[in-house]
Amino acid sequence: MEFVSGYRDEFLDFTALLFGWFRKFVAERGAVGTSLEGRCRQLEAQIRRLPQDPALWVLHVLPNHSVGISLGQGAEPGPGPGLGTAWLLGDNPPLHLRDLSPYISFVSLEDGEEGEEEEEEDEEEEKREDGGAGSTEKVEPEEDRELAPTSRESPQETNPPGESEEAAREAGGGKDGCREDRVENETRPQKRKGQRSEAAPLHVSCLLLVTDEHGTILGIDLLVDGAQGTASWGSGTKDLAPWAYALLCHSMACPMGSGDPRKPRQLTVGDARLHRELESLVPRLGVKLAKTPMRTWGPRPGFTFASLRARTCHVCHRHSFEAKLTPCPQCSAVLYCGEACLRADWQRCPDDVSHRFWCPRLAAFMERAGELATLPFTYTAEVTSETFNKEAFLASRGLTRGYWTQLSMLIPGPGFSRHPRGNTPSLSLLRGGDPYQLLQGDGTALMPPVPPHPPRGVFGSWQDYYTWRGLSLDSPIAVLLTYPLTVYYVITHLVPQSFPELNIQNKQSLKIHVVEAGKEFDLVMVFWELLVLLPHVALELQFVGDGLPPESDEQHFTLQRDSLEVSVRPGSGISARPSSGTKEKGGRRDLQIKVSARPYHLFQGPKPDLVIGFNSGFALKDTWLRSLPRLQSLRVPAFFTESSEYSCVMDGQTMAVATGGGTSPPQPNPFRSPFRLRAADNCMSWYCNAFIFHLVYKPAQGSGARPAPGPPPPSPTPSAPPAPTRRRRGEKKPGRGARRRK
């Protein structure tokens, strides 16, 4: 699949952005000394002419004593590829944070402190054998050690940990894999308690971070022990001023977050000693330094790191701070850094992966942007904007605990309840008897009491559901309820339309398989709402997928509608009962939750009534090539959602390859999430559960059934890449309908 927007963990895009900016910064900065001084002098004149940012900027000084970075060797023998942006954003980028585990991990530098007396003799013997190699545990500062490398050190020693070979060459590096070789040579293997001998982790002794008062990250620098020749962080900031000043200059000339180059109206520093050392340097830039250093980590109580919106070129993956990015002049969907990348993408082989083939189709998809952004909520304009700042939106509403942490890259601090991924869902928090506890924020309750009477009809929009449920249109709970409401919409609308012979609305029990369910299982309690919407139906949800926590395999628990109790019953899992317990007419109906942590084609169990998959991305996982034939053999109604119309087309192609069947025309999901998803290399609109389609199975031999519908006739394909042209004011662009909202 060409685009992975909506399927890739946001933290990976964030990591690629950090490494891309840091690599550029290190390459241009060079080593500390005369070269750095000259570089800063060149930037000073440029920065003095920059426009002023009215926001306060903050230079954070964050010491680190306890966390190290361990660089792995990758899945293949030999040095790993590192974590350069080419690997993070290449043709086959990792999609999940767990995919980084073979290459990088975080380790505690305090491990092994217990039981040191028992291992003291072994450690002394190892030191003698290694020629006195020192430990990589926490190092105390020494007065005669320098915090930063000197000008005599080569530039490649300032490369970030895990950087790619290309980045090393740009910073003055040499042979392939030199980074990993240097780590192996300079850090001797250590025997640590509970671990096998391995290369000692790198220690990021200090992190310099430039942000504005709103939390937008503008620049970052890492001081790493050993590999960069620095000492560990002590109580002072000796020789840190040149590094900090270079970081400030580069952050103004090339801000990492968003916006054009600019200088702050005022700067504050989070360290008293560094503040004094910068008093004579910062005024050179035409920037006012605060009279006193910042005494707390954040300049204001509402501070939160903002969503970063640095875009990338679809072909070479350069970020917007490295090159000016413009969309294709014909479809306006794909971003390129210049004509060379546009032409390369236009002429890709085979033809059906080239932009020449996709350009008219993407133009048609872009015309749906206005329709997808049409939602009844009071915050619609904000959350459907291309510049939507999700982290700030959630933080401003106090949505920083429970299931809301699954939507944000920010991890709550001590004292905040968090549903850890991989644990039995909600077990510890269900004991209070409130099934909606994990959906709450820091303020008033988001979910009102369950209405005393079941709905008289079926709902087909957020507006209707919110009205019946007593919810304000200012409530963002739709972001979490998109999953159960989508299941409800499939049961009450789509199955009766596409499979009327099943008479599904009259069934008193339904077995539903939720396939490739990872994120959905992490939010499992949101499916409680199905008991409110379908009170007379006994539901069984079987979550299946190899992305589920292995420890959850074969778990089974029951959510019950009546009584106020919450209990754990041995042998049958969890039994949860809500706080509103009037028994419904027609008898009690339960929601059974079962888990199978394996690919769907390996799952053994009773035939379901319905199969549902959320944001499936058939083309992104090889197991679908075996799971789709399994569904073909079962021939049960199978509905899937996708985050874009483009993804639906790709799923149809995968279905045709895997089974010879097809997919129904996708239709917008009225219960899609209102939050627009980030897209790094394109301008298309992506929303969780945006479109729905169902599988069209290949007719069985001799059945006489009609074959699966083929794909729609292709749009005419241009023969040459579109040339950027200027349109006169007032002239409309041909072939385009409603434009997406800004």
From Swiss-Prot:
Residue stretches of biased makeup (Basic residues): 725-742
Positions of the UniProt region annotated as Disordered: 109-199, 565-590, 701-742
Annotated residues for binding of Zn(2+) 2: 328, 331, 355, 359
Zinc finger (MYND-type): 313-359
KW DNA-binding (keyword) present: no
One cellular component term from this protein's GO annotations in UniProt: cytoplasm
Bias type Polar residues, positions: 151-161
Compartments reported by the entry: Nucleus; Cytoplasm
SS bond partners: none
Primary location class: nucleus
Name under which the protein is recorded: Zinc finger MYND domain-containing protein 15
Organism annotation: Homo sapiens
